[in-house]
Structures are given as C-alpha cells and as structure tokens.
C-alpha cells in the first residue's frame, strides 16, 4: 500500500524526532489513535493543532492546508488488506461482525454505531502468557428513523 507524500513526510519526521503518536497526542491534547489518523489523512486538524504539529516535527507550512482540509474519509485501498495486523481486524469482522451486530441490535434496536461521535483506544495489557492488545471502541448509537 502506498501513502500520500504528506503521510510519508509526517511519518519520517516523527521517526527522526524519536516521537510516538502518544507523545504527539500529549502535545496536542488529543488521543494517540486520532493523531495517527491525522497522519494517514483521515482526520482534520485545527489551524493551531497543525501549527503546533508542524513546528514540533520541523516541517514546513506547506503541509498545513492538507492537515486542515477535511479529507475523503475511508479512502484507503478498498481491497482486502494484506498487512497482517490490519488483516486481523478484517478477519475479526468476518468472524464476529454478524454476532456483534446481533448483540448490539438486541441491546439497542435497529441502528448503527457512529464512527463520527466515536473514540477508539489501544492499550497494552501485560500477561504472563504473552502481552495482549486491548482495543476499545465507543460510538454513539444511531437508531434508524422510521417515516
């Protein structure tokens, strides 16, 4: 998968500065996953956030317009992902997607979970049998309207 030049520049500068998404999130007052989504062109920064980010990374103002313009969300490669980590999420939805849908609808009714009024957090859970990845999604429930 190839990424836009802006993504490549942001990731390179982040690596050169020895920063993590969590470090940048603290600086901006935002969650690390949201910051990563900004790097990948899936979120929109305010002018102040873009200025602070670009200054921290030592990048020029020419990226500000890209960072502050609302993107076409979900515009990543539409084929089945081949990156093993990303593919696991695809596989999880293949296995658990319908069961999750049914459980959500039993609890809430007919509707969807918002990805707009939404947060996602990734945590490391230490375990003697091998560390675990904990992903928590929290989205507003939006019932389908009848008319």
Curated annotation (Swiss-Prot):
Is Transferase tagged as a keyword? no
Record: active site: 88, 91, 114
EC numbers, comma separated: 4.2.1.104
Catalysed transformations (reactions) = cyanate + hydrogencarbonate + 3 H(+) = NH4(+) + 2 CO2
The enzyme class is: lyase
The intrachain disulfides are: none
Which SUPFAM superfamilies does the UniProt record give?
A: Cyanase C-terminal domain, lambda repressor-like DNA-binding domains
Any idea which UniProt keywords this protein has? Lyase
Metal-binding keyword on record: no
| Any one GO molecular function term | cyanate hydratase activity
Q: Name one GO biological process term.
A: cyanate metabolic process
Q: Which Pfam families match?
A: Cyanate_lyase
Q: Which family does it belong to?
A: Belongs to the cyanase family.
Q: What does this protein do?
A: Catalyzes the reaction of cyanate with bicarbonate to produce ammonia and carbon dioxide.
Name of the protein this chain belongs to: Cyanate hydratase
List the source organism. Answer: Prochlorococcus marinus (strain NATL2A)
Give the encoding gene's name: cynS
């Amino acid at each position: 998968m190839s990424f836009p030049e802006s993504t490549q520049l942001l990731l390179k500068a982040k690596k050169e500065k020895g920063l993590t998404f969590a470090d940048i999130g603290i600086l901006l007052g935002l969650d690390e996953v949201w910051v990563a989504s900004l790097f990948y062109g899936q979120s929109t920064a305010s002018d102040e956030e873009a200025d602070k980010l670009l200054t921290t990374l030592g990048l020029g103002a020419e990226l500000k317009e890209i960072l502050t313009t609302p993107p076409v969300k979900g515009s990543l490669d539409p084929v089945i992902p081949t990156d093993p980590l990303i593919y696991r999420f695809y596989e999880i939805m293949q296995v658990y997607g319908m069961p999750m849908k049914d459980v959500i609808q039993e609890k809430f009714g007919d509707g969807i979970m918002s990805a707009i009024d939404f947060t996602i957090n990734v945590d490391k859970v230490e375990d003697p049998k091998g560390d675990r990845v904990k992903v928590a999604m929290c989205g507003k429930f939006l019932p389908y309207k009848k008319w």
